[in-house]
Design a protein with these regions (language model features):
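Pyridoxal 5′-phosphate
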Residues: 1-211
Length: 211
C-alpha cells in the first residue's frame, strides 16, 4: 500500500474451498474460475474494490461498459448456483476432503515417498513423489488403471515441461521434478476411490521395483 499499485489475487484455488474476504485482506482485484468449484467451464468472476478500472473490450455497454459482448447468462447463472452450493457446504466439504487427503497419506505410509509442501497447505491438492520412479511412467500406469493425476498444475496441462512451481521451490535440477505427481481431490471423490488409488499405487510400485 506504500506504492501506487493495485493488489490482484488469483484465487482460483481458494474460492469455493475457503472463506475469502477481499475487503478484510486489502485486495483490490480478485479473480476465480467457475469450474474450480464445479461450475461451468469458460466462465469466471472478477471482484474489484476499485470500480473505475479501464475496460479491455470496447463496443457494447455490457457488464457496466467494462467488457463488451453478449453475456453468457446460462453459464453465469450456473456459476452463481455452484458458488452458492460450495459456500453453503464450505466447512463440511473442507473436513471431508481433509479426511480423504489424510487417508491417502496414511495408506502410503509403508511406501518410500515424500510430500512436496510446507506445513501450511490445503487438503484439495497433494503433490507427492516416489524416489527413483519416473512420474511419466507413473502417470501412464495410473491412466491405464483409470486414475487421472498430473505432473503439474492445470495451467501447464498439455506441456512436457516439469512443474515450474517445484522448479522455483526446489531448483531446476531437483530430482523431485521428474518424480512428483499432483493429486486433486473434491467433495465428489469417495473413500472407495481413494482406496482404489492406494491399492493401485502399491501394485504399480511393486511391479516397477520388481523390474
Amino acid at each position: 500500500k506504500d506504492h501506487p499499485a493495485a493488489f490482484h489475487v488469483d484465487a482460483v484455488q481458494a474460492v469455493g474451498k475457503l472463506s475469502v474476504a477481499p475487503e478484510e485482506l486489502g485486495i483490490d482485484f480478485l479473480t476465480a474460475s467457475a469450474h474450480k468449484f464445479h461450475g461451468p467451464k469458460g466462465v469466471g468472476l472478477l471482484y474489484t474494490r476499485k470500480p473505475d478500472f479501464f475496460n479491455l473490450l470496447h463496443g457494447g455497454d455490457q457488464e457496466d461498459k467494462r467488457r463488451a459482448s453478449t453475456e453468457n447468462l446460462i453459464s453465469i447463472a450456473g456459476m452463481a448456483q455452484a458458488l452458492k452450493e460450495a459456500t453453503d457446504q464450505l466447512d463440511a466439504n473442507y473436513q471431508y476432503i481433509q479426511s480423504l487427503s489424510e487417508r491417502i497419506l496414511t495408506g502410503l505410509e509403508d511406501l518410500d515417498f515424500y510430500l512436496n509442501c510446507t506445513d501450511s497447505k490445503l487438503p484439495h491438492v497433494l503433490n507427492i513423489g516416489f524416489p527413483g520412479i519416473s512420474n511419466d511412467i507413473l502417470l501412464l500406469r495410473l491412466d491405464m488403471a483409470g486414475i487421472s493425476v498430473s505432473t503439474g498444475s492445470a495451467c501447464t496441462a498439455g506441456t512436457v515441461q516439469p512443474s515450474h512451481v517445484l522448479a522455483a521451490y526446489y531448483g531446476e535440477d531437483s530430482h523431485r521434478l521428474k518424480e512428483s505427481i499432483r493429486i486433486s481431490l473434491s467433495e465428489f471423490n469417495t473413500t472407495a476411490e481413494v482406496d482404489t488409488f492406494i491399492t493401485t499405487i502399491h501394485k504399480i510400485l511393486g511391479e516397477l521395483h520388481g523390474i
